[in-house]
């Protein structure tokens, strides 16, 4: 994770600096990064780091923006979904709510911070893979309240038409994205397995499972934290 945290610091500093300041090595010159070996951001082998990029950096961005008092926590996760069987493989990340800041509400149903990813169009997804996209809607009310509210997350349900191996890596399932300066926290995310009878079974934030044809995964992504009372 050594290079990962440096990129997060540069990203946050770049966002907070005036736009006319050029992005170059000089941005780091005044900074002294103290990250002791063996800590979360600088682990020793054999520490598990499989989600160090996609998950840890989202939490780190929230921490850094909050430390400067600039923004409440966004969803804090990439909501990673991957599935496949003997003839297809697919990977996506699902957007959520952004954190609010002084003078602006959080983004609604968008990837925030260093994500740089887009979802496959529903028509393309269903034509190329044995799945049916049953819901893809805003999760109304999941953003934290405040003078400037946090953004709402999303609900996304994918039903599999063939047996499928599914993996989920997601955060903010137990600890909600925090508000700032009296703003309320956003809602935690949820992962659910829907069986063929439509019964919902809660899943942990990180899980790998085998689904039968006709079963589905529903992901409720976190909302962002609110800013101010």
Show where each model-derived region lies.
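Glycine/proline-enriched, intrinsically flexible loops and inter-domain linkers
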Residues: 2-229
């Amino acid at each position: 994770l050594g290079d990962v945290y440096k990129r997060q610091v540069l990203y946050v500093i770049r966002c907070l600096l005036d736009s006319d300041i050029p992005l170059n090595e000089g941005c780091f010159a005044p900074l002294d990064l103290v990250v002791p070996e063996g800590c979360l951001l600088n682990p020793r082998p054999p520490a598990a780091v499989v989600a160090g990029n996609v998950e840890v950096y989202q939490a780190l961005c929230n921490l850094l923006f909050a430390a400067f008092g600039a923004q409440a926590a966004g969803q804090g996760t990439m909501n990673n979904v991957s599935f496949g069987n003997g003839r297809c493989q697919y990977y996506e990340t699902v957007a959520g709510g952004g954190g609010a800041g002084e003078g602006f509400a959080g983004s609604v149903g968008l990837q925030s911070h260093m994500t740089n990813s887009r979802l496959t169009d529903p028509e393309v997804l269903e034509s190329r893979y044995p799945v049916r996209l049953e819901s893809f809607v805003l999760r109304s009310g999941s953003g934290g309240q405040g003078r400037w509210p946090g953004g709402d997350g999303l609900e996304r349900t994918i039903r599999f038409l063939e047996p499928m191996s599914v993996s989920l890596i997601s955060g903010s399932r137990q600890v909600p994205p925090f508000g700032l300066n009296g703003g309320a926290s956003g809602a935690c995310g949820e992962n659910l397995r829907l069986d063929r009878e439509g019964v919902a079974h809660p899943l942990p934030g990180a899980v790998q499972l085998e689904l039968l044809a006709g079963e589905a995964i529903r992901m409720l992504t976190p909302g962002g934290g609110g800013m101010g009372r």
